[in-house]
Amino acid sequence: MMVVIADDLTGAAEIGGLALKYGLMAEITTTVNLHSKADLLIIDTDTRSLSQTAAKAVIREICTGLKELQPTLLFKKIDSVLRGHVLAEIQLQQELLQLPKALIVPANPGLGRTVVNSTYLLNGQPLHQSSFSQDPEFPVYSSGIRELLQAKDGDIQVLPHYAPQPGAGIVVAEVQNSSDLVAWSKTLDADKLVAGAAEFFATILEAMNMRPLVTKESSAILHPPALMICGSAFHKSRAFVKKIEQDGFPVSYMPAALGDASTDTQLFQLWMEATLLQLKQEGKVSIAIHPQMEDDKAHALNIRNRMAEAAAFIAGQATLHEILIEGGSTAAAVMRKLGIDRLYPTMALAPGVTRMRVQGNKELHLTLKPGSYEWPPLDLFPLMQ
């Protein structure tokens, strides 16, 4: 069995979509399932949304289970722009699993995300000049790899694949194109912890002689009633909500006051009543961040929790067949609130956008995507029309 440890639920779902592409049966869970029958076990730790201390505690627990499972391949799925506690988690995993070497390959060249001369570039421009600088939880203030990882002197080396590789320590890969990914995939060995973004994981699968399945492109058949949760503060997300509302998709905005640490149960109740009415009338509804809401770290946590409460309330009042969520921390909060701890990918709708079956509920499917990714085009996504 192969195992991927993801620090975020949408990252786990993205790997699940790749598993489908390569004909692998995948299971997404929050713990090490020693009895899993899957080809690929994907463990969502949700550590990106935790404090570093809490994240390390989760990693310790996961590594204990991994020692018993003994996977044939272990890959740590990280955020491609290195948000979260990436270095601290990798250093701890090295210690616990007794792996002297680690390789971090964050680049996704297919999405314009590259590492050149120790600098992270997005479509050729320094990362900190992009919308990632406005991330409420992990704002990007620098494009330097060492600064992004908060690395101290001697913690890491940033190297191209053709440079001599050290016998111990952590290497961050310079990558300009897919050929560089292929070259890095040939440097793996049993003493090396491998971490990276989705594109590198796909490259590793191909290095293992796996090939993408040839499938016909088809529209996603999604069944109402459907709830879409737009909890990401990214400008693309806000623009998307505005566009679908203009196109006639029912949108229920969270009252701005609920973005604060408000305990106004009456206001929450009124919002839910209005949302349920839209769902009943239209068969679908999106709950979204109010345009006037702040998107700093404190508000992000409140918004995430409110979105999860709203999802649980709506699911308790209506039978939902589809829940579509953007943003990994929001998705994880919703899953916890709904008591969901195991998912099985069934359809990759677009890069990073994966539809999954919920264990124990044949009627319900979850579709997840990272906040910085795009939803599929409307003509491939009939629910959005």
Report the location of each language-model feature:
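Cap/lid and interdomain-hinge subdomains that line or gate substrate/regulatory clefts
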Residues: 1-3, 25-29, 63-74, 78-190, ...
